[in-house]
């Protein structure tokens, strides 16, 4: 297996899901995928750009009788010797052999020259002065300065002393060796491969229930909770572990032999008979892929059952080759047909019961929900920021044939984790963040249409706008390229050992240096380090032990939200003082109790507060002594979940809808500029003469009426003291 050092992929890449086509002339979609692949690769900064030089102190007391040895040596003579030293090719060659490249050489030489030419030469190392004197008299060659230069360089850049050790510590090319418990077992690997709604997970879960001891690893806590509930309902005691909670079938003194968990919570030390790893294709995920790689290589079980897309089969086999494990593949076909409609929806009046409009932003969810309400259709709503309870409640309303909410508007969060009786999946757009949907993502979403054993067994996929339908058909017709790279992440032990050699480096600097010098093999890319670094920057000035800091920085927090990021920093600061993060302290910070949401901004505030409570519960699982009030905070989160449910129920009042628009304006807003124009306008920034609101109007579907309403809300906020 080839070893690739130096430049690494930090934030994952789309290379594993956007491989170039084997055909001579790639399609437009493959070309765009290749471009996305190139643009998504983040190169690690070179180590010489990361290290900070240290000041080398002069000797405080000169050796007696130095004048006799150095004679008439002065700074001018020293400068001449140093200039000649710097120009020697042999000196540069020796420097490179010791890890000092050209950029580091210039920085180290500048420091060395400053050290050698102070106003008072008596403060310089006597041995160096004697050599300088001999060189100036022609008795010695300037290349003999190299040992002094190298010693000085290692004082200026301490990492040079430990480069070999740092490279060994940060070697990520053999992750199989990180899991001795799994390597002590001759494991049987079964791959249940098939599309959505093929029954692949069902067959793996049958083996889960039959085993004497088993663990289910799901991608979401919603799915882990569903398996937990269903297993216990079948009379098989099963515990639940997610990042935020642990629940027992009986009690914590009597753990069950069956466990349902999120994939990150799998213990690689626990020996069981069966482990089921769902959605194995998530290996390619740029943020969480490391967890599936870890589960695949580290699960200590006699049988490993993998469920997922066929695109992951080859990479799974390659990952297991070095340890001599083979894979038995079992293929499953979709149980009910999925067809692509010949016509787009085009008008909200064509929406029917069982339809699901899939959007790729919360704003688009709000917009489409408003238009449906204006057409007399009350939709259920699901998007990523909603708490699990609210998502389940909205899913239940949509699935209930007697409920008036028989249409769903959702983000691509419905791609996994929720059982939904969808007849038609309607793509509101074929782009996500101005980029075309990759084929595997479009198939995952479209596959939610039609559910075996329900009234909507036959699924249909289409688009809202007719100009998108051809694009969707082309995307879905593309072959899903086999996954070629999977995520990997450094362990805490590696980071800790790394820090021993660089005791003065901050945690942010440690992460940067680790990524710069580490090695990964061709089948891996580094993920999570970028997200971890964002959190590390937030608490860089907070004095925390390394283990605590590392744990804080691995928490699943959305740093894009400034409020939750600010609360995260406050939690870290209080932790650093040794004060417990109590329920009273947390509630005071959140200005509890919250007010019911009467606007979208107030609903968003409730969602942010829920994320803060979620963060508290996540940390309390790891530091129960410092965050002692997890039960009370969990009760508060349930209250908040219910308030958010109520807010979503009163969706139209939150949208502050005015009089209905005429049908012509509605139809006009259904049309959208081409994907090329959309991508171009998204990159345009407002000029000084244009307002931010006008710029937003140009690059979104916001209507003039929506804009007036937005201005009105902003003016109200501005008038508040």
From Swiss-Prot:
Residues 343-499 form the Helicase C-terminal domain. GO terms for molecular function: ATP binding; ATP hydrolysis activity; DNA binding; DNA helicase activity; RNA helicase activity. It is found in: Mitochondrion matrix; Nucleus. ATPase and DNA/RNA helicase able to unwind DNA/DNA, DNA/RNA and RNA/RNA duplexes in the 5'-3' direction. This is ATP-dependent RNA helicase SUV3 homolog, mitochondrial. ATP binds at residues 194-201. Residues 1-29 form a transit peptide. Belongs to the helicase family. Residues 655-691 are annotated as: Disordered. GO terms for cellular component: mitochondrial degradosome; mitochondrial matrix; nucleus. The lineage of its organism: Eukaryota, Metazoa, Ecdysozoa, Nematoda, Chromadorea. It catalyses: ATP + H2O = ADP + phosphate + H(+). Its EC number is 3.6.4.13. Residues 181-319 form the Helicase ATP-binding domain. The keyword Transcription does not apply. Keywords: ATP-binding, Coiled coil, Helicase, Hydrolase, Mitochondrion, Nucleotide-binding, Nucleus, Transit peptide. Its cofactor is Mg(2+); Mn(2+). It comes from the Eukaryota. InterPro entries: DEXQc_SUV3, Helicase_ATP-bd, Helicase_C-like, P-loop_NTPase, RNA-DNA_Helicase, SUV3_C, Suv3_C_1, Suv3_DEXQc. Residues 692-720 form a coiled coil. Residues 663-687 have a biased composition (Basic and acidic residues). One of its GO terms (biological process) is mitochondrial RNA 3'-end processing.
């Amino acid at each position: 297996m080839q070893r690739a050092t130096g430049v690494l992929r930090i934030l994952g890449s789309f290379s594993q899901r956007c491989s170039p086509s084997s055909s001579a002339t790639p399609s437009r979609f493959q070309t765009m995928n290749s471009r996305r692949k190139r643009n998504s690769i983040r190169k690690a900064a070179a180590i010489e750009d990361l290290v900070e030089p240290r000041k080398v102190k002069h000797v405080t007391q000169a050796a007696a009788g130095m004048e006799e040895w150095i004679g008439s040596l002065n700074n001018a003579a020293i400068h001449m010797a140093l200039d000649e030293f710097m120009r020697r090719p042999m000196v540069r060659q020796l420097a490179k052999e010791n890890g000092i490249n050209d950029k580091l050489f210039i920085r180290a030489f500048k420091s060395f020259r400053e050290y050698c030419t102070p106003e008072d030469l008596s403060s310089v190392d006597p041995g160096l002065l004697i050599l300088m004197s001999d060189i100036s008299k022609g008795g010695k060659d300037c290349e003999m300065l190299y040992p002094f230069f190298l010693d000085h360089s290692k004082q200026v850049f301490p990492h040079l002393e430990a480069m070999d050790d740092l490279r060994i510590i940060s070697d990520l090319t053999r992750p199989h060796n990180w899991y001795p418990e799994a390597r002590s077992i001759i494991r049987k690997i079964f791959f249940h491969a098939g599309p959505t709604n093929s029954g692949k997970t069902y067959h793996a879960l049958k083996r889960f229930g039959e085993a004497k001891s088993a663990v289910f690893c799901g991608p979401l806590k919603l799915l882990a909770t569903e398996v937990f509930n269903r297993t216990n309902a079948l009379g098989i005691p099963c515990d639940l572990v997610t990042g935020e909670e642990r629940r027992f079938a009986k009690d914590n003194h009597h753990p069950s032999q069956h466990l349902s968990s999120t994939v990150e919570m799998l213990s690689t030390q626990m020996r069981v008979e069966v482990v089921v790893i769902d959605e194995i294709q998530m290996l390619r995920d740029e943020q969480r892929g490391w967890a599936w790689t870890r589960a695949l290589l580290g699960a200590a079980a006699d049988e490993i059952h993998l469920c997922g897309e066929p695109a992951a089969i080859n990479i799974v086999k390659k990952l297991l080759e070095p340890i001599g494990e083979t894979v038995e593949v079992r293929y499953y076909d979709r149980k009910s047909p999925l067809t692509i409609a010949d016509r787009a929806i085009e008008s909200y009046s064509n929406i029917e019961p069982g339809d699901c409009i899939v959007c790729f932003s919360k704003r688009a969810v709000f917009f489409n929900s408003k238009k449906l309400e204006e057409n007399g259709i009350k939709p259920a709503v699901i998007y990523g920021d909603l708490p699990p309870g609210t998502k389940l409640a909205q899913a239940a309303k949509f699935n209930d044939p007697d409920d008036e909410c028989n249409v769903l508007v959702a983000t691509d969060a419905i791609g996994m984790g929720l059982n939904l009786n969808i007849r038609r999946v309607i793509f509101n757009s074929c782009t996500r963040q101005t980029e075309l949907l990759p084929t595997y993502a479009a198939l995952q979403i479209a596959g939610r249409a039609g559910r075996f054993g329900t009234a909507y067994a036959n699924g249909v996929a289409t688009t809202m706008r007719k100009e998108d339908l051809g694009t969707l058909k082309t995307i879905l017709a593309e072959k899903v390229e086999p996954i070629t790279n999977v995520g990997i992440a450094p362990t805490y032990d590696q980071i800790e050992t790394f820090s021993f050699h660089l005791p003065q480096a901050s945690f942010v600097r440690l992460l940067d240096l680790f990524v710069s010098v580490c090695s990964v093999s061709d089948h891996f890319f580094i993920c999570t380090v970028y997200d971890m670094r964002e959190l590390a920057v937030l608490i860089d000035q907070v004095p925390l032990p390394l283990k605590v800091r590392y744990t804080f920085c691995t928490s699943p927090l959305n740093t894009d939200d400034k409020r939750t990021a600010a609360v995260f920093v406050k939690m870290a600061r209080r932790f650093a003082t040794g004060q417990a993060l109590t329920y009273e302290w947390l509630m005071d910070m959140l200005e509890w109790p919250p007010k019911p949401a009467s606007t979208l901004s107030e609903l968003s505030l409730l969602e942010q507060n829920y994320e803060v409570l979620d963060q508290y519960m996540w940390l309390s699982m790891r530091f129960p002594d410092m965050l002692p009030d997890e039960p009370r905070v969990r009760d508060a989160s349930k209250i908040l979940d219910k308030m958010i449910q109520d807010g979503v129920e009163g969706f139209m009042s939150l949208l502050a809808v005015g009089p209905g628009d005429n049908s012509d304006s509605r139809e006009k807003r259904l049309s959208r500029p081409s994907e090329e124009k959309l991508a171009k306008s998204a990159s345009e920034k407002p000029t000084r003469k244009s307002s931010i609101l006008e710029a937003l109007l140009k690059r979104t579907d916001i209507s003039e009426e929506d804009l007036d309403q937005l201005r009105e809300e902003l003016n109200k906020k501005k008038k508040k003291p």
